[in-house]
C-alpha cells in the first residue's frame, strides 16, 4: 500500500456514537446443531436477504425479508381498507398469508398501527394477530405478528419477491409486546436461545455453510465453525435521542437499533461521511464521475433507496487496487476494522467491457452540513468478512473475523 493509502474513519460508533466505551459482554455461543437452534439459508435479493418460514395451520410457506431494523414480524395479508378481500387487497403475483386458511390464527386487541414513511409502501398500516410460526423445525404457537391492512387496494403496492418482513431489531429497554421479534418471543417462551448468528459466504472458499444460499442465519445460537469465540469483540447498544428516526420517522421515537448494523438492505457499500468520500476520490487517480447509464446500473445492484443519499458515483480502474486506500474503522474507540479496496471497488457484470465503481454509501442520515457524519451504516461491505452475533438478552452485538477456510 502507499504511505497515504489508509483512510482512517475515526468513529466512536456503536455508542451512537457517544464517547463512552461499551462494556465487554460475555456471549453464550451454542453450535448450530443444537435441537433448539435453527440454521437457515438466505438468498440475496436487491431488497436484502430472503429466507423461508411457515406460518399458520396447516403451514403456509412465506418468504421473509431479513431486516435488522424491523421489530415484530410482518406478513402481507388479504386485508386492506379495513376488510378481508384478497381480490382487492393483493396484487396478482404477490405472495401473502391467508389467515382464513389457518385454523390457529386469532385477532388481538392491540391497536392498529401506521408508519407514514417506509421503503415498502406509504402509510404502512398493520393490524396485530397471533398464529403458529416455524423457523426451520422450531415452531412457536401464538406468535404476535403484524398483518397488513393498507388504506388502499393491493394494486397500489408494487409486487415484491417476499410476503413478509422478519424483524431482527433489539427490543427497547421498556419492552412492549408489539416490539418483540419472533426469535425474542421464542426465547421468552423457552423454545430458543437469545442469540442470532449471521454470515455471508461471499468471500468463503466453500459456500457449504450457507446451504445453497448466499448467507446463513442461525436462530437461537451461532455457527461456531465460522469464527473463534476468543476473537469476538462485543458492544452494548447505545441509542441517543437524535438517532430515534435514523431509518424512518417513528412515533413514539425509537430507541432500539443495533447502533447501527444492517446486513445490506439499507446500504450495500462501504460507509463513509461525505468528507471521507471526497478524500477517497481525491486519492484515486482513475476516479471519474459515472455516466447516467452507469449510475442507473449501480442503483439496480440493491438497496431500498429510502436511506440512500443523493451522492455522486465514480468509476475507477479495475486494476491497480493495491494503490487504493484501505478504509479503517475504529468502533467505540477500541477495535479497528479494515475494508480493503477489493471489498469497496465493485465490478458491474452486466455492462460491456470492464467497468468498476466505488461502492461507497454516504448514508442519508449520516450527512451533516460540514460533511462529517455522526453515524454511518455498517452494511454488507463491512460485514462480509465478519461473523455477526446479535444477543437479544444482553442487548449487545459481537463481531469476529470470519474463518474463510
From Swiss-Prot:
Belongs to the peptidase A1 family. Its EC number is 3.4.23.-. The keyword Signal applies. Glycans are attached at residues 52, 61, 107, 123. It holds the Pfam family Asp. Induction: Expressed under high amounts of nitrogen via regulation by GLN1. Moreover, components of the fungal-specific velvet complex VEL1, VEL2 and LAE1 act also as positive regulators of expression. Finally, expression is induced under acidic conditions in a PACC-independent manner. Disulfide bonds join 318-356. This is Secreted aspartic protease FUS4. Residues 49-400 form the Peptidase A1 domain. The gene is FUS4. Disruption phenotype: Does not alter fusarin C production. GO terms for biological process: proteolysis. InterPro entries: Aspartic_peptidase_A1, PEPTIDASE_A1, Peptidase_aspartic_dom_sf.
Amino acid at each position: 500500500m502507499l504511505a497515504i493509502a489508509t483512510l482512517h474513519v475515526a468513529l466512536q460508533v456503536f455508542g451512537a456514537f457517544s464517547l463512552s466505551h461499551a462494556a465487554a459482554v460475555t456471549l453464550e455461543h451454542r453450535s448450530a446443531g443444537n435441537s433448539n437452534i435453527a440454521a437457515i439459508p438466505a438468498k440475496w435479493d436487491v431488497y436484502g436477504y430472503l429466507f423461508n418460514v411457515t406460518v399458520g395451520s396447516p403451514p403456509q410457506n412465506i418468504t421473509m425479508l431479513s431486516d435488522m431494523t424491523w421489530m415484530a414480524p410482518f406478513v402481507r395479508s388479504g386485508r386492506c381498507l379495513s376488510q378481508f378481500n384478497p381480490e382487492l387487497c393483493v396484487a396478482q403475483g404477490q405472495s401473502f398469508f391467508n389467515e382464513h386458511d389457518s385454523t390457529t390464527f386469532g385477532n388481538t386487541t392491540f391497536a392498529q398501527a401506521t408508519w407514514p414513511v417506509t421503503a415498502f409502501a406509504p402509510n404502512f398500516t398493520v393490524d396485530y394477530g397471533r398464529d403458529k410460526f416455524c423457523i426451520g423445525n422450531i415452531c412457536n404457537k401464538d406468535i404476535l405478528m403484524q398483518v397488513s391492512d393498507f388504506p388502499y387496494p393491493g394494486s397500489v403496492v408494487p409486487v415484491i419477491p417476499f410476503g413478509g418482513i422478519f424483524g431482527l431489531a433489539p427490543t427497547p429497554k421498556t419492552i412492549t409486546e408489539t416490539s418483540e421479534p419472533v426469535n425474542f418471543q421464542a426465547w421468552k417462551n423457552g423454545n430458543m436461545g437469545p442469540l442470532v448468528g449471521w454470515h455471508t459466504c461471499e468471500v468463503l472458499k466453500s459456500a457449504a455453510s450457507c446451504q445453497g444460499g448466499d448467507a446463513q442465519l442461525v436462530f437461537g445460537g451461532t455457527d461456531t465453525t465460522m469464527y473463534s469465540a476468543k476473537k469476538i469483540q462485543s458492544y452494548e447498544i447505545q441509542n441517543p435521542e437524535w438517532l430515534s428516526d435514523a431509518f424512518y420517522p417513528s412515533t413514539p421515537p425509537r430507541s432500539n437499533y443495533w447502533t447501527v448494523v444492517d446486513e445490506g438492505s439499507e446500504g450495500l457499500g462501504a460507509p463513509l461521511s461525505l468528507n471521507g468520500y471526497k478524500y477517497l476520490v481525491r486519492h484515486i487517480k482513475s476516479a471519474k464521475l459515472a455516466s447516467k447509464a452507469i449510475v442507473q446500473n449501480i442503483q439496480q445492484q440493491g438497496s431500498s433507496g429510502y436511506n440512500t443519499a443523493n451522492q455522486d458515483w465514480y468509476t475507477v480502474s479495475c486494476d491497480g487496487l493495491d494503490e487504493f486506500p484501505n478504509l479503517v474503522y475504529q468502533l467505540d474507540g477500541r477495535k479497528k476494522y479494515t475494508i480493503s479496496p477489493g471489498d469497496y471497488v465493485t465490478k458491474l457484470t452486466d455492462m460491456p467491457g470492464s467497468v468498476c465503481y466505488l461502492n461507497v454509501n454516504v448514508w442519508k442520515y449520516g450527512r451533516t452540513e460540514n460533511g462529517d457524519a455522526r453515524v454511518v451504516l455498517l452494511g454488507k461491505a463491512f460485514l462480509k468478512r465478519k461473523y455477526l452475533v446479535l444477543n437479544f438478552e444482553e442487548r449487545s452485538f459481537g463481531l469476529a473475523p470470519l474463518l474463510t477456510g
